[in-house]
């Protein structure tokens, strides 16, 4: 029998009988740690799961960066993310291609923000501490802070140049200055930093960027330097032009200044179509008793001028057209079926009937109006109701007359129609038998008469 103690962890004793005979014992047992598999009153694991194992989330590291000569190598990934990426923007040809070559003298100090993708709860304090230590160690105290946090989201600093999804952008040719304080008048206008032509859709989101400056993380508020807005890369993979995402605000605390629906609105076209069901025409075929529903759909192109306001997320409205399936009730008379198309009712004919039973059908005036008009439908229904009422009255009077001619049911006013039909059939059969007997008796009497006439003739001749 294999031992219950795991080979990899000899100090742990198996308490679960289900895992007792397993050849490979797990490292964590359901009954060992109440943090994972606790009772119904236990709380689910939260952010302190990393404190329990003394681990930190390890995001994918950016490419290796070239650091200034006086600055030491980064000790961890958090410090490396905060350092400028100099090898990306070392080529002057690339700077001239993006129009950023003359932006180096606008502001004297670029400070790179943390990676907006990895600004979680557990890494935020480590990033703060790394920035403060970096600034105090090589670049001076961070106490003197600038007083322009509003343009920090949409503005860029002197070397503020970013490419693609890299959150660390910008560099300086010389060493960083020791004094980080800047007057509010030297804050850079976003229009000066980004001279690229932008469309109407993206320019609408630029004024909203300064108002969302408090949404940045604690790293920005502790250092208090102008933030850098990354320029969207041309080869982003979404198929949009390079200037479609130039003025998007950067939020490093996980709170996006633009909602998720903005990205969905960017993918929608300016010219959309609205489909409305205009006319519904219903026809009923009397031959096959099936409802035929015709939907007339008109398509109107809607050109919406997208100004400062956002487009609604569901402008493309498509009303679903569901065909109406109606089951014909064969027991009830259809109002669409005319009385001429209905099968003729069988009339009970009796030889003793005093008058012929007829169903008076007035000639139907044929109208040239369409079949779907309200006047035609109402007139047809009215004529059908009149004819149906007259037919029922004639049928009732026929049963009453037949009942009066049957001797057994003359005084029975509550006789059912089935009883009337049965008694009338028996009475007709009895009358036919009596008629046959009377015919035989008549033939005998005629033969007797012929014999008597012959005798009388013979007596005269003698």
UniProtKB/Swiss-Prot annotation:
Residues 19-47 are annotated as: Interaction with AURKA. It is found in: Nucleus. InterPro entries: bHLH_dom (IPR011598), HLH_DNA-bd_sf (IPR036638), Myc_transcription_factors (IPR050433), Tscrpt_reg_Myc (IPR002418), Tscrpt_reg_Myc_N (IPR012682). Its main location: nucleus. GO terms for molecular function: DNA-binding transcription activator activity, RNA polymerase II-specific; DNA-binding transcription factor activity, RNA polymerase II-specific; kinase binding; protein dimerization activity; RNA polymerase II cis-regulatory region sequence-specific DNA binding; sequence-specific double-stranded DNA binding. A motif (9aaTAD) lies at residues 76-85. Transmembrane segments: none annotated. Keywords: DNA-binding, Nucleus, Phosphoprotein, Proto-oncogene. Residues 61-90 are annotated as: Interaction with AURKA and FBXW7. Residues 257-276 have a biased composition (Acidic residues). GO terms for cellular component: nucleus. Residues 138-174 have a biased composition (Low complexity). Pfam families: HLH, Myc_N. Residues 431-452 are annotated as: Leucine-zipper. It comes from the Eukaryota. The modification Phosphoserine is found at residues 259, 261. Phosphorylated by GSK3-beta which may promote its degradation. Phosphorylated by AURKA. One of its GO terms (biological process) is embryonic skeletal system morphogenesis. The 9aaTAD motif is a transactivation domain present in a large number of yeast and animal transcription factors. Positively regulates the transcription of MYCNOS in neuroblastoma cells. Efficient DNA binding requires dimerization with another bHLH protein. Binds DNA as a heterodimer with MAX. Interacts with KDM5A, KDM5B and HUWE1. Interacts with MYCNOS. Interacts with AURKA; interaction is phospho-independent and triggers AURKA activation; AURKA competes with FBXW7 for binding to unphosphorylated MYCN but not for binding to unphosphorylated MYCN. Interacts with FBXW7; FBXW7 competes with AURKA for binding to unphosphorylated MYCN but not for binding to phosphorylated MYCN. This is N-myc proto-oncogene protein. It comes from Rattus norvegicus. The gene is Mycn.
